[in-house]
Amino acid sequence: MKWKGLLFTVLMIAMLILSACGQDASTPATGKSKESDTSEKKLKIGLSVSDLTLERWQHDRDFFVDKAEELGAEVIVQSANGDEAKQLSQIQNMLSQDLDALVIIAINSDSLTTVVEQANGEGVPVLAYDRLINGADIAAYVSFDNVRVGEMQAEYLVNLQPSGNYFLMGGSPTDNNAKMFREGQMNIIQPLVDSGAIKIVGDQWTKDWDANEALKIMENALTANKNDIDVVVASNDNTAGGAIQALDAQGLVGKVLISGQDADLAAIQRIAEGKQTMTVYKPIEAIATKSAEVAIQLAKGEKVTSDTTVNNGVIDVPFIQLDPISVGKDDIMNTIIADKFHTYEDVYKNVPESERP
């Protein structure tokens, strides 16, 4: 009997030990499964693009999506095609899709406060891409030194034509960058205006950066000044393209200096052909990939650091600032072609082979 009692006791102890071991083994397994679910969850980033009908933003989208996907994120892209109300609606729609971060290329820098507040309320950090968003608590801003862009445009033109009649063709009046470009342009031009060397014979902003609007503005400016314009300070390539159509109708292409920005293919072709004087190349791959990297950081809840900040009327926003590049006819090969931004064949397709570099 004693032997049977002892055996029963040993069996009970063994069962208790096995039961305890089973509980210990199952608890970590459950915890590991949760960690696995978290680590395997793909980050979701919303990219609100101002206008994909413009070539410039198509490049940005492609580079951004490629980099974000390489880093393991899913990207939802929507384009407002220049419509402010549509951009607001699209952003609200994206916020309903469980985003981890939101990246906005703003149409109107001053109209996004409400949707940024909504994003913040839902725990979705907002990154301003290329265009600063004013009056809102955004997490970061990635762009080029836009004042420097304007300075580069004016410097290039002033070096070639330090006196004469200048017409200022600004960008969209609702785009904060357009104002920064103008600030940079006037840093260079104003001293020459003050000295009497340069006369500003017109100054207009171009709604939505629209080429057709720029064409009309330039036609009216030429009429008002009896074609006596030496330089057009156009703030981007799209507006430059519209202005050049008006100049062409008056036989002034290649005679009137004109700036641009973005290094659109059509603009680089015009520069190669001698129709446009210069553009400012903002390496799109650089801003797109950097923005994707910053968006991933924000999506993971990581802090973004920067060397400088910019005040948007509410906070000092961490500003990741990139350097632009001035491009004239002699610079195309070692910038645009070297970076494979456009191909040699595309750029020089309208230039006789004997005149190609």
Residue ranges and their predicted role:
Residues 3, 22-357:
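A residue-level marker of the well-folded mature domains of exported/periplasmic proteins
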Residues 8-9, 232:
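Short, surface-exposed loop and linker segments with low hydrophobicity and enrichment for Pro/Ser/Thr
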Residues 17-20:
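C-terminal motif of bacterial Sec signal peptides marking the signal peptidase cleavage site
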